[in-house]
């Protein structure tokens, strides 16, 4: 039997305080308003006989005479095949105008996967983006952020990854989206043809902060069920984790919590880690691979959100000047697949390309300072132009093997074979035949 409480003693922002007993942290409650409408709230704090709840959708229209019913469970989301191709909001309700989703309700506040059932990742997730596939491979079950500078088209990059990945299901969690961003997600998913294998959980900038905090939990809870129950390889794309952290900060300030670095709550690290640690490769099952976008306010990588994220994740993609910067990017798991599930020349070729491109940056500095360029400097600058056009550009969309072949061609067009520092047996096998005399 459910107990109905009517003593709402305080309404502050999106929070209400109720005189009640027996509630637990994270428990869901239904608020029955005097005008007949209802809304949901989640328990954030309890003290003696007072319980503080965060109201989904805000407290506008609430009165102290409304009734609060604790439901004895945490927030749930519908899981099932009917979820594929749908778009839902921050409380799990459809927003695509196609009716209700049918399936089983699952709790979203679940612990991370049992470490005993995890396996060491050994498979590559292909994206057909050379700066990822060649130089910083995305590995199945990896958790990795995209650190985005101001003005970068990170959402367009996410949509390309979603369209070109070989994952079975793509789950997108959008937080703090403008209407333009949301429309872009919908239109691109249809144009690129992956809408029928995707699920979108969307929080718009005008929605309540608590709904923003729920988006990653809903996306990851559904991903885990698809991976465990159906052995699916799921790619989860979250944007923007800075908006997620800002929502946590807003809630913490409303609750009068003592702020930590730059006003963010002291629990920021654990709040981020709790979500990222959901990435998993399951023995005898599927997998969850997690890519998130973390925008850097003022391009400051020491900002608390990217700073904490870097300690949790397994590398990062640095999106800068409309390309993935090879020097700021890192995949800590790439050694598990390079040369093992990819071609034997992958590692040596990638290292040579990056080394020569780094040298070309120095040659470019010498040129900008007016120094006389050597023949080697001129070769490096010619190589850099080819490298940036044919491999670094985000417009390039080619499979890994073709990207490796292009890498060899770029080297052959710019250097003699003995100048690139690659093993002779690989030179003999992969150096373009028409350029063997070089």
UniProtKB/Swiss-Prot annotation:
Pfam families: ATP-synt_ab, ATP-synt_ab_N, ATP-synt_VA_C. InterPro entries: ATP-synt_VA_C (IPR055190), ATPase_F1/V1/A1_a/bsu_N (IPR004100), ATPase_F1/V1/A1_a/bsu_nucl-bd (IPR000194), P-loop_NTPase (IPR027417), V-ATPase_su_B/beta (IPR022879). One of its GO terms (molecular function) is ATP binding. Transmembrane segments: none annotated. GO terms for biological process: proton motive force-driven plasma membrane ATP synthesis. Belongs to the ATPase alpha/beta chains family. Produces ATP from ADP in the presence of a proton gradient across the membrane. The V-type beta chain is a regulatory subunit. This is V-type ATP synthase beta chain. It comes from Chlamydia abortus (strain DSM 27085 / S26/3) (Chlamydophila abortus).
